[in-house]
């Protein structure tokens, strides 16, 4: 309704978010502030529509939301997630680059409090240009935060240009390994592969975990896949009809 949004970035991580909330994460929609729940941070906060959809499917909103009224004035579902207005949001985000450092803080708190929960972060490959990301990575290494799992959405695009045009990031996995992280590289659209990677990470002790995912921006829509013009935008009525057919949805 706000006539704006970020559909490409949201679809890039749809399979990861769905797998985390519907399979991997230990959360309770009836008690969203449960002290022992797993934590989730969407560092690339502009992709939040897919987070809202996952929370909805998991049962955080009663009755189930049929129309999100995304970005509408006064709506619970704004263009960047807010922990103060939307149930189930563990951390407000939108200012790129902060998720890993905040996640490291949450994971460190769990260690100090002797809690067993995991903290999951999804960040974009573009935002890894922010120095604070690597400060968080370094801190997590030093504290051996093996309860921290960071997914990197390696779709190759950022707001206006390719990531490689701005600053080459082809060696993302090697950078994490150089910092001492347990690192895996997978497809971000293989549900079984995502499940397996999470299981491996949770069983590997002594190091924080990076799961670098090869993703396709706008995944699932023929007119949107790998088309950076859809970093922002709103489909036309005709494109909505195409999207419903290609994604198998009704609305």
Task: Please place each PLM-identified region on the residue numbering.
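Structured core elements
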Residues: 41, 149, 185, 210-212
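Cofactor-binding active-site loop characterized by glycine-rich and histidine/acidic residues
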Residues: 11-142
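Histidine-centered active-site/metal-ligand motif
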Residues: 6, 46, 79-80, 98, ...
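Glycine/aspartate-rich loop-and-adjacent alpha/beta segment that forms the canonical ThDP
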Residues: 191-251
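Glycine-rich beta-alpha junction loops
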Residues: 15, 46-47, 51, 155-156, ...
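Thiamine diphosphate
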Residues: 88, 92-203
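Structural motif
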Residues: 4-11
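N-terminal capping segment at the start of a domain
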Residues: 1-4, 153-155
């Amino acid at each position: 309704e706000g006539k704006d949004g970020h559909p490409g970035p949201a679809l890039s991580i749809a399979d990861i978010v769905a797998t985390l909330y519907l399979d991997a994460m230990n959360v309770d929609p009836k008690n969203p502030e449960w002290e022992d729940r797993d934590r989730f941070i969407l560092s690339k906060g502009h992709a939040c529509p897919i987070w809202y959809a996952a929370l909805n499917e998991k049962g955080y909103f009663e009755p189930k939301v049929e129309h999100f009224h995304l970005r509408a004035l006064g709506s619970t579902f704004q263009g960047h997630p807010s922990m103060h207005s939307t149930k189930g949001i563990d951390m407000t985000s939108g200012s790129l680059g902060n998720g890993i450092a905040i996640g490291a803080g949450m994971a460190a708190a769990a260690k100090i409090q002797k809690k067993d929960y995991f903290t999951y972060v999804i960040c974009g490959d573009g935002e890894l240009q922010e120095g604070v990301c690597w400060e968080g990575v370094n801190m997590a290494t030093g504290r051996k935060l093996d309860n921290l799992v960071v997914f990197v959405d390696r779709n190759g695009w950022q707001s206006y240009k390719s990531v490689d045009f701005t600053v080459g990031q082809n060696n993302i996995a090697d950078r994490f390994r150089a910092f001492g992280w347990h690192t895996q590289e997978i497809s971000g659209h293989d549900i079984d592969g995502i499940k397996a990677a999470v299981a491996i990470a949770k069983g590997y002790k002594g190091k924080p975990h990076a799961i670098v995912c090869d993703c396709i921006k706008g995944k699932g829509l023929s007119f949107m896949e790998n088309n950076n013009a859809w970093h922002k935008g709103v489909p036309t009525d005709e494109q909505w009809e195409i999207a419903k057919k290609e994604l198998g949805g009704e609305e």
